[in-house]
């Protein structure tokens, strides 16, 4: 039982770490000399533009789409952290034989948020790049970066973690 508990805790921490990395790091769309993410576009290692600071004629078109991705990724990270804290509380407060349903529900909501954020980015990326050609002129010949891939891996991990909490019962 102790080994299973340790595995579940490590699995949850890894899931949360993946969410933090994918949300914070600048590698959702990458190429040889550029990178772009939810927060900024860097055309080289020193020339970065924050997408929320653009105003006037250079304003970021479709910023509401990017804000939706930002919000869902941040929410998924927060929900995963809350779910872990609730799991620790339930570990000491639940009666023997009860399930970790609340932890499972919150973790599955985190999973849903990651899926929504990554899906929106997948669907709207090309439109965002075409609408903001001045900002993304070097970024047309890129590919999805590791942060984007980590977001999808975090989706799978949070889903599996949520299911594990649903099945898990508290034992002695």
UniProtKB/Swiss-Prot annotation:
Its membrane topology: Multi-pass membrane protein
Pfam families in UniProt: PMP22_Claudin (PF00822)
GO MF: integrin binding; kinase binding
UniProt entry keywords in alphabetical sequence: Cell membrane, Cytoplasm, Glycoprotein, Golgi apparatus, Membrane, Nucleus, Transmembrane, Transmembrane helix
Stored InterPro entries: EMP-2, PMP-22/EMP/MP20-like, PMP22/EMP/MP20/Claudin, PMP22_EMP_MP20
Known role: Functions as a key regulator of cell membrane composition by regulating protein surface expression. Also, plays a role in regulation of processes including cell migration, cell proliferation, cell contraction and cell adhesion. Regulates transepithelial migration of neutrophils into the alveolar lumen, potentially via mediation of cell surface expression of adhesion markers and lipid raft formation. Negatively regulates caveolae formation by reducing CAV1 expression and CAV1 amount by increasing lysosomal degradation.
Family affiliation: Belongs to the PMP-22/EMP/MP20 family.
Record protein name field: Epithelial membrane protein 2
Organism listed in the record: Mus musculus (Mouse)
């Amino acid at each position: 039982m102790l080994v299973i508990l340790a595995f579940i805790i490590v699995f949850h921490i890894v899931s949360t770490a993946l969410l933090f990395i994918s949300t914070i790091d600048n590698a959702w769309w990458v190429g040889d000399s550029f990178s772009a993410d939810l927060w900024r576009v860097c055309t080289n290692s020193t020339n970065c533009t924050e997408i929320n600071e653009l105003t006037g004629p250079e304003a970021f078109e479709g910023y509401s789409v990017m804000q939706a991705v930002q919000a869902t990724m941040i929410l998924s990270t927060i929900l995963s952290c809350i779910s872990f804290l609730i799991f620790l509380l339930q570990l000491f407060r639940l009666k023997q034989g009860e399930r970790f349903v609340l932890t499972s529900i919150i973790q599955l909501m985190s999973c849903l948020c990651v899926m929504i954020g990554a899906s929106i980015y997948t669907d709207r990326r090309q439109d965002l790049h075409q609408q903001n050609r001045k900002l993304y002129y070097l970024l047309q010949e890129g590919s999805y970066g590791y942060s984007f891939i980590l977001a999808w891996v975090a989706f799978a991990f949070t889903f599996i973690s949520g299911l594990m909490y649903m099945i898990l019962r508290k034992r002695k």
